Amino acid sequence: MMYSVDTTNQFEKSLKECKRQGKRIEDLWEVVAILMEDGCLPDEFKPHMLTEEFAGLWECHIEDDWLLIWKQNDKRLTLLLTDTGSHESLFGRKE
């Protein structure tokens, strides 16, 4: 069974910024396709749950400093893409 995907307005805004920066947007959609099919990602993308004010959200690395944040509901098979960008743009700090 495949997961369905929805996006937030913040994700769409950040996606436009990534396009403006020349990011390979197809790389992001390849990661999303794996998530849709499997509900999880290989370790190479460093998937992990976030904590504190981001509790309940997942994060992975599309590139070293290009992240995807999403909310996942395994019972409903839904993925909500909430944001994407650098550590600094998402969390206010550089990694």
Regions found by a protein language model. Name each.
Residues 1-4, 13-16, 20-23, 62-67, ...:
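Enriched for short, Lys/Arg-rich terminal
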Residues 8:
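Residue-level signal for threonine
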Residues 25-33:
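PIN-domain endoribonuclease scaffold, especially VapC-family toxins
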Residues 29, 45, 55, 63-65, ...:
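Short connector loops at helix/strand junctions that flank enzyme active sites
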Residues 31, 37, 46, 75-76, ...:
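Terminal low-complexity, poorly structured segments
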Residues 31, 52-54, 69-73:
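Short alpha-helical linear motifs
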Residues 34-61:
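A short, surface-exposed loop/turn module that caps and links secondary-structure elements
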